[in-house]
Swiss-Prot record:
A cellular-component GO term for this protein: plasma membrane
Superkingdom field: Eukaryota
Protein name: Olfactory receptor 4C45
InterPro entries noted in UniProt: GPCR_Rhodpsn, GPCR_Rhodpsn_7TM, Olfact_rcpt, Olfactory_Receptors
Gene, per the UniProt record: OR4C45
Amino acid sequence: MNNVTEFILLGLTHNPELQKFLFVMFLITYLITLAGNLLISVIIFISPALGSPMYLFLSYLSIIDIFYSSSIAPKMIFDLISENNTISFNGCMTQLFTEHFFAAAETILLSVMAYDCYVAICKPLHYATIMTQSMCGFLMVVAGILGFVHGGIQTLFIAQLPFCGPNVIDHFMCDLVPLLELACTDTHTLGPLIAANSGSLCFLIFSILDASYVIILCSLRSHSSEGHLKALSSCASHIFTVILFFVPCSYLYLRPLTSFPTDKAVTVFCTLFTPMLNPLIYTVKNKAVKNVIKKLWKQIMTTDDK
């Protein structure tokens, strides 16, 4: 039986001055996230020079980051200046689904990108025959489907729990642990199963990524010094992105089902700052992307002068 039609979100802080500061900072960060990831996606789609699988996956990652951040950030930002910090039951379930859908899709996509890096370094002569356009499309579809399944399982598990009274969530969003704490039933058995769906996915993919890079680093011994540095440079951005994504993910889901004061800060970092940093990580040392951006900028300036 479910008597709860809406949840009250306590948010990040009750300090009015801090709320105003966070509102401005988070709004700017979110707009940079949208602009940066959209720019990367558009540049890759319109530039023939960035037609390799690596850039195709990067554009897909940017699109996922836009939706992932947008599933949480707008509501969180608006609530900082709103006096009515509530969310309907259906809205809560929708937020839970979209968050886990896009997070899982990104998790799987990062493993696909690691596989692409492995093939490029360890099997360079067979790269063109393995990483075909159809294979890349297939891998991206698989990431989307598995993300959808993961998000659906999490949402169905939570939605069927009875919520009969308490409806105050000590968070700025709907997530597994806060909702399990409000359920009017014993969740000692079901709770770990729900958490394991996220925790096991996080642990499995992170283990696959670790194994991939161990193999890559071992294979680099047979490369020349120049080839060694070039290969490391091509993978460094991906490794940094993996660390930014999986360290917070592991903290949130590879642990007992208990809320901690730091959960809110870690979630903000995951959903707002990591998606903002990803475009910067992949462009700072990427000459191909920077050259395309410079070329497009020159074309725009030339057009304006005319």
